[in-house]
Regions:
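Short acidic, glycine-rich surface-loop motifs adjacent to enzyme active sites
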Residues: 44-61
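Conserved beta-sheet core of the metallophosphoesterase superfamily
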Residues: 60-135
Length: 175
């Protein structure tokens, strides 16, 4: 857990959690950790970020949907309840962005693995966060970048890039 001060003087709380289970593809946070998570986010902060390995919602284009954490519904409810703004994850190596219950859920690709899905190419996410917006950009090392989504934090409205839905097609390889 980190307490940081951002560029615009925003206070930031970042909590990272190990969701892995030995020898299993599925993950879990576990009810025994919920009170600890709640406590970490109890201090006032302008921005609250939660990071974990597994994703909390199924990722399109990844086949089997069994690789969310076992307690994903409870975890999403908890994170919404404690005012988390952003969840970061990446188990399936496929970038995607959702807005669920005022929580921006951002799944990342990978630049360090060859375990890619379909035509998804190596990438990582860049998040630019201000008091008004959260802009998510996919960066493709050495080959460019693509705007993924823009969250208006005042209206809590997500504006995803309509081309993102086609990222599983071969045409998505052009930045």
């Amino acid at each position: 857990m980190l307490h940081l001060t951002g560029r615009e003087g925003q206070t930031v709380t970042l909590v990272a959690m190990d969701s892995t289970k030995p020898d299993l593809a599925e993950g879990e946070i576990g009810r025994e950790r919920y009170s600890w998570i709640r406590q970490q986010f109890s201090a006032p902060a302008d921005l609250r970020i939660f990071a974990l390995h597994h994703h909390l919602v199924p990722v399109p284009g990844t086949g089997r949907e069994r690789n969310t954490v076992w307690d994903s519904g409870d975890v999403l409810a908890l994170l919404s309840d404690v005012g988390v703004n952003v969840v970061l994850s990446g188990h399936k190596h496929v970038p995607f962005v959702w807005l669920l219950n005022n929580v921006l859920v951002v799944n990342s690709g990978t630049v360090s693995s060859h375990r890619l899905r379909g035509y998804v190419r190596p990438s990582y996410n860049l998040l630019e966060i201000t008091r008004e917006r959260i802009v998510v950009t996919l960066r493709y090392p050495g080959t460019g970048e693509r705007h993924a989504a823009d969250l208006d934090r005042r209206e809590m409205r997500l504006y995803p890039n309509p081309d993102l839905a086609g990222m599983f097609a071969k045409s998505a390889w052009h930045a």
